UniProtKB/Swiss-Prot annotation:
Residues 102-121, 348-395 are annotated as: Disordered. SMART domains: HhH2, XPGI, XPGN. It comes from Aspergillus fumigatus (strain CBS 144.89 / FGSC A1163 / CEA10). Its EC number is 3.1.-.-. Binds 2 magnesium ions per subunit. They probably participate in the reaction catalyzed by the enzyme. May bind an additional third magnesium ion after substrate binding. It comes from the Eukaryota. It is found in: Nucleus, Nucleolus; Nucleus, Nucleoplasm; Mitochondrion. This is Flap endonuclease 1. GO terms for cellular component: mitochondrion; nucleolus; nucleoplasm. One of its GO terms (biological process) is base-excision repair. DNA binds at R47, R70, E158, G231, D233.
Length: 395
């Protein structure tokens, strides 16, 4: 699920933190990719007539088709992908996972009913909701990556957190995931839509954490508190607290402790905090996740030449893929992984840190922008009020 409405909040309050560009802009870069999120998106998106792709023996192959061709697309564009797989989820996440399982069960039942009585659109909608990534999907994707010569590692718990560690250490340029909570784990740069198909024509979103914090006027701890208020995988959200309210509460009170205190002491009882809401535990999971340090032996990785014949054996003979396409893909891998060894010019230079004066200037501009927005909203509200007060037919 990630963090609800976080992209919207950053887009509206820290637009300089987001860049949209073409996949070609990332030539020569190493990227750590959230594998489980990618596989889930492949299972949903790679379909034929509303159904997942199957081999002749009835095995699902959508995850392999997506992994093979989307990885090829990255390598064709000079990117060196590293996939990171989820480990065991933190205990605090078990409640959210239980809810997801229940929703899948409901969707499965609705899917069966739609097949009997519903429209094609209903069948497609509920079919997508039943999708879940299994151990078998993960194991087959790992086998495929090994044969392709693409490295992968297993995270102790959350893949996004491990991707963030590698990005902070400079072992990769960025972490790639659709989950915005990757920023909560302190990934300096988050790439979204990297594993989308070319047909979707979605630009790659590049989100810079330091610019987001500057634009929001927050430190990292406040940012995490904001994300918990917005709604994360570890806790159920506070009813009636949307993105604007969450942002206002953190800016006004500065921390979740003070937000909770203000809500509990509010005589109007406008918001009600859930009975079990261990926000401090959730914050701790974001601040100190269970990860391996970047210099750990299990975080060593390298790209190798594909094992062409073993790839053909697995994808063509076992899974029913087209042999010409698989061999063509293997040839592209061999050629383009060598090309991607070229260094980007930016790798020779270190970014210059902003001075205190520059930071103060940015904060001043941000505060001025906020004041302008507040003033505009007041004027709009006043104009609406005056328009309502006018009698009908009045000029």
């Amino acid at each position: 699920m990630g963090i609800k409405h976080l992209f919207q909040v950053i887009q509206e309050n820290a637009p300089d933190a987001i860049k949209a560009g073409d996949i070609k802009n990332h030539f020569g870069r190493k990227v750590a990719i959230d594998a489980s999120m990618s596989i889930y998106s492949f299972l949903i998106a790679v379909r034929s007539e509303g159904q997942q792709l199957m081999s002749e023996s009835g095995e699902t192959t959508s995850h392999l088709m997506g992994m093979f061709y989307r990885t090829l697309r990255m390598v064709d564009n000079g990117i060196k992908p590293l996939y990171v797989f989820d480990g065991a989820p933190p205990k605090l996440k078990s409640g959210e996972l239980a809810k997801r399982t229940a929703r899948k069960a409901e969707a499965t039942e609705a899917h069966e009913e739609a097949k009997e009585t519903g429209t094609a659109e209903d069948v497609e909608k509920f079919s997508r909701r039943t999708v879940r990534v299994t151990r078998e999907h993960n194991a087959e994707c790992k086998k495929l990556l090994k044969l392709m010569g693409i490295p992968y590692i297993d995270a102790p718990t959350e893949a996004e957190a491990q991707c963030a560690v590698l990005a902070r250490a400079g072992k990769v340029y960025a972490a790639a995931s659709e989950d915005m909570d990757t920023l909560c784990f302190e990934a300096p740069i988050l790439l979204r839509h990297l594993t989308f198909s070319e047909q979707r024509k979605e630009p790659i979103q590049e989100i810079h954490l330091n610019r987001a914090l500057e634009g929001l006027g927050m430190d990292r701890k406040q940012f995490i508190d904001l994300c918990i208020l917005l709604g994360c995988d570890y806790l159920e959200p506070i009813p009636k607290v949307g993105p604007n309210t969450a942002l206002k509460l953190i800016r006004e009170h500065g921390s979740l402790e003070k937000v909770v205190e203000a809500i509990e002491n509010d005589p109007k009882k406008k918001y009600v905090i859930p009975e079990y809401w261990p926000y401090q535990d959730a914050r701790e999971l974001f601040l100190h996740p269970d990860v391996r340090e970047a210099d750990h032996p299990e975080c060593d990785f390298k790209w190798e030449a594909p094992d062409v014949e073993a790839l053909v054996e697995f994808l063509v003979k076992d899974k029913g893929f087209n042999e010409d396409r698989v061999r063509n893909g293997a040839a592209r891998l061999q050629k383009n992984l060598k090309t991607a060894q070229q260094s980007r010019l930016e790798g020779f230079f270190k970014p210059v840190a902003r001075t205190d004066e520059e930071k103060a200037s940015l904060k001043r501009k941000h505060d001025e922008k906020l004041q302008e927005q507040k003033k505009r909203k007041k004027e709009e509200a006043k104009a609406k009020k005056e328009a309502k007060a006018k009698p009908r037919g009045a000029a």
